[in-house]
Every structure is written in structure tokens, then in C-alpha cells.
Amino acid sequence: MLRILLSNDDGITAPGIQTLAAALREFAQVQIVAPDRNRSGSSNALTLDSALRITTLSNGDIAVQQGTPTDCVYLGVNALMRPRPDIVVSGINAGPNLGDDVIYSGTVAAAMEGRHLGFPALAVSLNGQQHYATAAAVTCRILRALQHKPLRTGKILNINIPDLPLSEIKGIRVTRCGSRHPAEQVFCQQDPRGQDLYWIGPPGEKFDVAEDTDFAAVEQGYVSITPLQVDLTAYGAQDVVENWLASMAD
């Protein structure tokens, strides 16, 4: 039976992870190791300055107290799930992780940690907060396909699903990340003692929404699958930097 380590960044009680766990348990052994609270936007943060405590729920799910998604996958793989998983799955996130959003996403980071530790990994996000059953069904279909024929790319699959009934999903597209304009908004308030409080504003407006992007696919009713990689090296820029350094020596 397929062994799945399941995590997220919305917290262990979030409807996305619970809906997905129920669907996956129809054909796989699932161990949830997830934050005890919402840790959205935590990216790849790893807790190094304090100890981590866990709470094991009556059904065997494990909540990591004040843990990040990366903490959860690290602990799940290296300490809490035995035997180790066959694959790491993160989600279902309440809201999309498209374009530049993947930089900040705890959902994507959990999958990234799984891949970094040597396991196949999926990040799953719903473009809304209604049709979690659709996202769960799509995820199960993809996992069954991977079980039948493993995808040997060494990449993370970042999956974004339109917030639609399953019957209205048009298909699946392999995409690249689109991009947004830089975010600029900060909201400032004052507390009753006159101290300034700052709230980070919404993401920037979409910029690159070409037909081959994740933005376009989801907007048009398609599931978007974008392969992502742990290696952030910009290989195409190496010669440019070499030439720049050489010119400095002249």
C-alpha cells in the first residue's frame, strides 16, 4: 500500500487537509504531520532556536506545536513516520499558489522539503475555498497514476485546481509559473497606546499571464501542473556573470 506523508500550511484542522486525507485513505496509508495553526506564507522557514513539541490526536494525526510546514515534513520523514513515506503531499491549500506566490508558500515549501529529503512530492492548492472534493479527486487521480507509472523527473509537482465542480474541470495542462508586479501596499494603524502597527497588503497584480502559464490554465478551468525544482541555480546566467567578472579585471 502506498505510504503518504501529508502536511500543509493552513493547519491540521483545515478542511483542505482533512478532505484530502479522507480521500487518500481509500487506497493509501496516510500519516498527517501538520502545523497546529495556520502558518500560511511561512515559506521554507525551519525552527532552529527552540524545541518542537507534538500532539498526537486520537486518530493518529500529529500536530506540531508552532511548527512550520518545513518543520513538519522534516520531522515526519526523519522521526515520526515509520516506515518512511513513499511520497510527500502538501495541501489542499485554501487558495492558489500560482506564479510568484510559490516563493512565499508554505504549501509549496512542505513539498520542497520532501523533495530535498529525497522523496517525490506534490503541492496541491485550490483556487478558492469551496470545492475541496474536486481537488481531492484530482490529487487521487494523479497519485494513482504515479503509483502505476512513477514520474522520474526529480521535480516537485505544483498543482493548482480551479474552484469548480469536478464535472466542470476541462482537463490538465502542464504549465510554467506566471508572474506578478511587485507588491507595494502596507497598511499602517495605531494601537491604543499610539504604537504603529503594520499589515502587509495583497500581492501585486498579475503581469505574465501568457497562455502557457499557471495563471491562464486555472483561469480557463484547467488544472495546472508546474514542475518545480530545489536547485535554484540560474545556469543560463553563469556565463554572463563570468564575462562580467572578467570585464572588471580589465
UniProtKB/Swiss-Prot annotation:
Residues bound to a divalent metal cation are: 9-10, 40, 93
Q: What Gene3D superfamilies does the record tag this protein with?
A: Survival protein SurE-like phosphatase/nucleotidase (3.40.1210.10)
The free-text note explaining how the cofactor binds reads: Binds 1 divalent metal cation per subunit.
As cofactor, the record names: a divalent metal cation
Question: Disulfide pairs?
Answer: none
Question: Into which family does the record put it?
Answer: Belongs to the SurE nucleotidase family.
Give the chief site where it resides. cytoplasm
Q: Where does it live in the cell? A: Cytoplasm
Protein task: Nucleotidase with a broad substrate specificity as it can dephosphorylate various ribo- and deoxyribonucleoside 5'-monophosphates and ribonucleoside 3'-monophosphates with highest affinity to 3'-AMP. Also hydrolyzes polyphosphate (exopolyphosphatase activity) with the preference for short-chain-length substrates (P20-25). Might be involved in the regulation of dNTP and NTP pools, and in the turnover of 3'-mononucleotides produced by numerous intracellular RNases (T1, T2, and F) during the degradation of various RNAs.
The molecular function GO annotations come to: 3'-nucleotidase activity; 5'-nucleotidase activity; exopolyphosphatase activity; metal ion binding; nucleotide binding
Q: Which reaction does it catalyse?
A: a ribonucleoside 5'-phosphate + H2O = a ribonucleoside + phosphate; a ribonucleoside 3'-phosphate + H2O = a ribonucleoside + phosphate; [phosphate](n) + H2O = [phosphate](n-1) + phosphate + H(+)
Any one GO cellular component localisation term in the record: cytoplasm
Q: Does the keyword Hydrolase apply?
A: yes
**What keywords are annotated for this sequence in UniProt?**
Cytoplasm, Hydrolase, Metal-binding, Nucleotide-binding
Top-level enzyme category: hydrolase
Which Pfam families does the UniProt entry name for this protein? SurE
Q: What is its EC number?
A: 3.1.3.5, 3.1.3.6, 3.6.1.11
Q: What is the protein named?
A: 5'/3'-nucleotidase SurE
